[in-house]
Every structure is written in C-alpha cells, then in structure tokens.
UniProtKB/Swiss-Prot annotation:
It is found in: Cell membrane; Cell projection, Dendrite; Cytoplasm. One of its GO terms (cellular component) is plasma membrane. It comes from Mus musculus. Phosphorylated at Thr-211 by STK11/LKB1 in complex with STE20-related adapter-alpha (STRADA) pseudo kinase and CAB39. Phosphorylation at Thr-564 by PRKCZ/aPKC inhibits the kinase activity. The keyword Nucleotide-binding applies. This is MAP/microtubule affinity-regulating kinase 3. The keyword Membrane applies. It is a peripheral membrane protein.
Length: 753
C-alpha cells in the first residue's frame, strides 16, 4: 500500500514533546527506565521517522479533544493494538488534574470483562499517556444509528453485560455518572465494554455527592433538581434510559432545549412502544422511578424476569472478581526472552505498577487479531475488527450457559478472549522481539507524519476495546453477548438502510462552585411548562434511504452534533479528558441540544450555549488535490504511463473483507475498480472533494466550510464474502447527521452499481 498524503484541512499540528522522558508522578505511575523500546523485528519493523511512545508505535489519531487526543498504536513487543490517550497536563487546572488522577486510580482497580482495561501509565512533565484497550467494534450508539433498535433478545444480551459491569463498579464503591450509549463500546466479538470513567467517583454509604454531571437525556431527575445523591441511584436511572434506547432506538426523554428536556424528565412520563414486551416495560418501571429511594438496586434488578429470560438456569449474579493471575509461567518465559529479568517481572506484577512490564504481561494474555492478518495491512483496516470472515460453526465448546443462542464464532475469534480459556491465548510460534535499551529521548515523536483527522473517542480512545482482561485468570465472561441472526443477514440495500436516527449527546458537569447557576436554571426551568405529556411518535426523517424505520421516534433535531468513533476517526464532540476545564461549570466542549434552542436566560445556560457552539471548522477545499494514485499514474482511467509492476500491483489489490454489513449502503457484483470509478464520477458530479487514501478507500468532503453543512466521510469498496458481493461502506467522520444524510443519500442514489 502506498503512503497516504493527508489533505491539508485535516492535518494535525505537532504535539509538544510527546516523548517518555522525565520522572512520572508516583501516585499515577511507576516506570522503569526502559520504556522506549523500539521495534527491531518482523512484527514491528519500522523506520526511524515513525513516531513512538514508549514501547508503542503510533499508527493514527482516532480521537481528539480540547486537552487530549487518542491514538491507535501497536505494542512493539507483542504486536497487540492499543489505544493511547495523550493528555496535555499543561492545559489543565489543579482541579482538573486532580480529577484526571482520580480517573486513573479508578481504572487501575477495575477488572471486569465488560469494562475497558488499563494497561500502562506513562507520565512526563507535561504529558500523561494512558495505554488502554482498543475498541474495534465501535460504539453502541453508532450501532443503533446504523442498524436501528435491537430485538429484545439482542438487547438482553448486551444489557446483562452492562448491568453486570455497573453492579461490579457499585460493589467496589465506584459510581460511573456518565452512562450513555456513546460510552458503551463493542469489542470484536460484539461484547460490551464500558468506557470513559472521567466523571466517575468513589462514594461512601451515608455520604452524599452533589456534582451534577453526565449527559442530560440520561441524567436522573434529582440531578436536574440540584439535590445531593448517594451515587448508585443515578447510574440506575441512566441504565433505564439505556435499556429503553436499546429496545426502541430512541430516547425516553427528549426536548428541543434543556428546559423542555428537564420538564419531561421531572414529569417521568415516556411512551411505551407497541412492540415492547410487558416484561421489558415492567423492568423499565423499576429503573425510571422519580423517587431515588424507591428506585431499584442492581442486585434486585439482576433477579428480574426479563433480565433472565432464556437464562433461567443461569440467573445473572454479581460478578466475582477472580484472583489476579500474576504467575503465568508461559508469559513470564516469553518476557524473559524479551530481556526482562524474573525479579523485575515479579516486582512489577506484585505491585501492579502499570509500567511497561505490567503492560507486556497483560497484552501477552490477549490473542491479537492482527497476528492473523498480514503485517502489511493498511492502517485503515486497523480501525475495524480484523477477523476472518468465515465462521467455524462447530467451535462452540467450553462456553458458559450464558452463551446459549449465541452465534458461533471461529476458533481464531474465540482465542481473542483469554478468559474463555484455561490459559492465555499466546501464539506458540510467534517470535517475540527483545526490548531495546534505547531511551525514549532518542525517539522524537513527530505526529505530522501520521494522517490524522478531526475525530472523536471516549476515554478509551477508540474507546479502546479489546476482550476480557487477562487478569481474570480462567474465569469466563458470565455475560457473553448473544448475537442474533441479524449479524448473518445479507447486506441491506440502500433503499432499506436505517441511518442517523439518533443524535449524539454531550456530557457536562456543574461543580459545587456553580450551584447558584444550576439553581437558577432549575428555577427558571419551571416557566412556560405547558408541554404535552406524551410525544407523538414520528418516523425518522434521517434515514439514508427513502424507507424509514417506522417504529423509531424522530431523534435528530438539526443538532450540529459531533460524534465519537472507534476505529474510525470523526470530529470530537467532547474533550477526551473528562474533567472540567478552566470554567468551573463545564467539563467539555459540547454542542447545543438544538440549533433552535434559546440563547439562555441564566448564567449556566449562557455558558453552555457560548462555550458549546465553538467550531474549529473554518475551512473549505477550493480544489481537489491530486491523489497518490493520480500522481503515480495509478488512477483508474488515467492515460499516464504505468509500469507493468504497478499494473500488477493494482490488479492484485483486493478490497478489504468486512465481517459486518450494517454500514453498507449498497451492494454490487461489479468489479471493485469499476465501482471506484463510478464513485469518483458521482463525487465529481456533486462537487465533492476527495482524496484516495488507499486503493479502495476515499476520504470525502462536501460543504462550504460552515459547521452546519460541512461534512467529512469515508467511502470504501469492501468485499462481503458471505454474500459473494462487493459493497460501498459509508462512514461519517464529521458534520451533522442531517448534512451527512443529505449528501450520502444523494450519492448512494446516483451510483449506478
């Protein structure tokens, strides 16, 4: 694959001194002096100019916020992919720093198969690096936008995992406080991973918390009322909103502005879709209770009839954290071969230092999908789950009773989850490299060499997802997701594809210092409260196709939303760091709930609207730049002379195979090169700028530079092996859902495939 030349509009300015040198803060990390290992072998061969952080080779930016960015990276010693959250500490005030360190401390003590795992912490004088699981399956939010509501069987499988993970947090006296569809990630096997603990806090029974934080549509009524709370009950309310969202594809409480939303939440009335089962409705009534004292606990909800339907012999129970497995001799032997001594390995693991040794040990316990693929795979492919398309339907042994009804997966996929096996999934034939003794100061990080785009991600960065933590020893995930037959269905044609029916929600926090502002909003929110009790269901008008999903409430309201994607970049909707900036009342740059919202009569409201409407989108393309394929004479239809070697290379190049098909807008039996030629023709006809990033991947831009109508997206021709067809994958990078829907549907309809 030829080297990509990023468009100027998405170039990223250099990051200041992202090199692991200097002593880290002891409360955050304990590092050895050899965190700068460079690649020296076939697993991670690289040129000197490639940027590194510690033992990690940076691949591309997958998330970006005010004070942080998230990069996809590969661990040089093991070849595993990770997400690295890079936080600029110099931009944070003391309060924000304190919350950042609290987030790190909380992530260190969490060890659940459905919670994103922290591997390593590297700290310099100016920068903090959090190395975490990489999310290859994306967000539940994006799944719902692309696929519509889940069937209750599928929703139950996901929700059991969510409840198990949140209850585990509560039993460790941790409250998340920002549970929403955007912070629920999917790993390669479509299992849930909860991410983004930036708003989490430790609670004590008998003590009250008083910080209002989270996303308003998911926030409990007591938060809108400015009341103090114990902690777990606000998560329980958010789980009720999530359950409703999974089953219906829409929010139970919504409004065109914050005041309207607040009134609907405080009224506590929501529409029950006709297709929702009685058991599911009854479960919702245990979550969405206005009085927090009467709201159900997760221990009680785990015994609910709907939760355990189909799992009668294996009722959902509180997760029992297994003893830490720090004595796996197979992994230790591999690390000794890398150059680590037995003594330093034991010291690091016994103290759980979260240094390079801890990270290497943890990563060795994970089967890397990338090892199954060619090392020459493009970095674009790294953003998706690279699993073999074929499925061994016979490999279904060794699963817990929770796996009944789950789709079978190939043996390579099952090796991905260490907790599903009696031992870590360590390839026996892989020759692991030896660590380098080179200091990190020798490897200056030059991020301008990485194609980067305005993108988003949650705390995990690709909100970093991988399977269950190897620290779980032999304990299997008791809540592994049931994947319904939906995943095996043919790709949906353009005319039937569900699209952007949901609008991304922003998270913010009111600190104690803005209590007066919050009270003002609450009091003023009582004015003009003549709002109908029930919303009339309206078919979504935001489908890519003319056929809409009839059972989904109209979700978007023209919001200039900015989305969070894993594995695929998109403009950031919130700061990757999840703590408040200099403003005492806001923690994120966010987007107004609606473009038509009032400009705010209160201090908090004005802060929200003024702070949240800023855009860094003041650019446009005047002329499409020549792509690499055009410059090298490899542009289809070009009359330039092309060498026979180049022709052979083009002829042998094949589209990437996709395991899932919900992002497909159209399918065709046409030759992939002919499909690319047709796509370029339609893009030119619609005045779209584009760049050919790879053989079958285009990065596209449309609009006049204003935030309301500027859209960036990817179009890729992919192979659908199960259907023996090729498809066109659309992936929104930035811009509003409405603007993307308009241009994407126009292009899809004009394609003659």
């Amino acid at each position: 694959m030829s080297t990509r030349t990023p468009l100027p509009t998405v170039n990223e300015r250099d990051t200041e001194n992202h090199i692991s040198h200097g002593d880290g803060r002891q409360e955050v990390t304990s590092r050895t002096g050899r965190s700068g290992a460079r690649c020296r072998n076939s697993i991670a061969s690289c040129a000197d100019e490639q940027p590194h952080i510690g033992n990690y080779r940076l691949l591309k930016t997958i998330g970006k916020g005010n004070f942080a960015k998230v990069k996809l990276a590969r661990h040089i010693l093991t070849g595993r992919e990770v997400a690295i959250k890079i936080i600029d500490k110099t931009q944070l005030n003391p309060t924000s720093l304190q919350k950042l360190f609290r987030e790190v401390r909380i992530m260190k003590i969490l060890n659940h198969p459905n919670i994103v795992k922290l591997f390593e912490v590297i700290e310099t004088e100016k920068t903090l690096y959090l190395i975490m699981e990489y999310a290859s399956g994306g967000e539940v939010f994006d799944y719902l936008v692309a696929h519509g509501r889940m069937k209750e069987k599928e929703a139950r499988a996901k929700f059991r995992q969510i409840v198990s993970a949140v209850q585990y947090c509560h039993q460790k006296r941790i409250v998340h406080r920002d549970l929403k569809a955007e912070n629920l990630l999917l790993d390669a096997d479509m299992n849930i991973k909860i991410a983004d603990f930036g708003f989490s806090n430790e609670f004590t029974v008998g003590s009250k918390l008083d910080t209002f934080c989270g996303s308003p549509p998911y926030a409990a009524p007591e938060l809108f009322q400015g009341k103090k709370y114990d902690g777990p009950e606000v998560d329980v309310w958010s789980l009720g909103v999530i359950l409703y969202t999974l089953v219906s594809g829409s929010l139970p409480f919504d409004g065109q502005n914050l005041k309207e939303l607040r009134e609907r939440v405080l009224r506590g009335k929501y529409r029950i879709p006709f297709y929702m089962s009685t058991d599911c409705e009854n479960l919702l009534k245990r979550f969405l209770v206005l009085n927090p004292v009467k709201r159900g606990t997760l221990e009680q909800i785990m015994k609910d009839r709907w939760i355990n339907a189909g799992h009668e012999e294996d009722e959902l129970k509180p997760f029992v954290e297994p003893e830490l497995d720090i004595s796996d001799q197979k992994r230790i032997d591999i690390m000794v071969g890398m150059g680590y001594s037995q003594e330093e390995i034991q010291e690091s693991l016994s103290k759980m230092k979260y240094d390079e040794i801890t990270a290497t040990y943890l990563l060795l316990g994970r089967k890397s999908a990338e090892l199954d693929a060619s090392d020459s795979s493009s970095s674009s492919n790294l953003s998706l789950a690279k699993v073999r398309p074929n499925s061994d339907l016979s490999n279904s042994t060794g699963q817990s009773p929770h796996h009944k009804g789950q789709r079978s997966v190939s043996s390579s996929q099952k090796q991905r989850r260490y907790s599903d096996h009696a031992g870590p999934a360590i390839p026996s034939v892989v020759a692991y490299p030896k660590r380098s003794q080179t200091s990190t100061a020798d490897s200056d990080l030059k991020e301008d060499g990485i194609p980067s785009r305005k993108s988003s991600s949650s705390a995990v960065g690709g909100k970093g997802i991988a399977p269950a933590s190897p620290m779980l020893g032999n304990a299997g995930n008791p809540n592994k997701a049931d994947i319904p037959e939906r995943k095996k269905s043919p790709a949906v044609p353009s005319s039937n594809t569900a699209s952007g029916g949901m609008t991304r929600r922003n998270t913010y926090v009111c600190s104690e210092r803005c209590a007066a502002d919050r009270h003002s909003v609450i009091q003023n929110g009582k004015e003009n409260s003549a709002i109908p009790d029930e919303r009339t269901p309206v078919a979504s008008t935001h489908s890519i196709s003319s056929a809409t999903t009839p059972d989904r409430i109209r979700f978007p309201r023209g919001t200039a939303s900015r989305s969070t994607f894993h594995g695929q970049p998109r403009e950031r909707r919130t700061a990757t760091y999840n703590g408040p900036p200099a403003s005492p009342s806001l923690s994120h740059e966010a987007t107004p709930l609606s473009q038509t919202r009032s400009r705010g009569s209160t201090n908090l409201f004005s802060k929200l609207t003024s702070k949240l409407t800023r855009r860094n989108m003041s650019f446009r393309f005047i002329k499409r730049l020549p792509t690499e394929y055009e410059r090298n004479g490899r542009y289809e239809g070009s009359s330039r002379n092309v060498s026979s070697e180049q022709k052979d290379e083009n002829r042998e190049a094949k589209p990437r195979s996709l395991r899932f098909t919900w992002s497909m807008k159209t399918t065709s039996s046409m030759d992939p090169s002919d499909m690319m030629r047709e796509i370029r023709k339609v893009l030119d006809a619609n005045n779209c700028d584009y760049e050919q990033r790879e053989r079958f991947l285009l990065f596209c831009v449309h609009g006049d530079g204003h935030a309301e109508n500027l859209v960036q997206w990817e179009m890729e021709v992919c192979k659908l092996p199960r259907l023996s067809l090729n498809g066109v994958r659309f992936k929104r990078i930035s811009g509003t859902s409405i603007a993307f829907k308009n241009i994407a549907s126009k292009i899809a309809n004009e394609l003659k495939l």
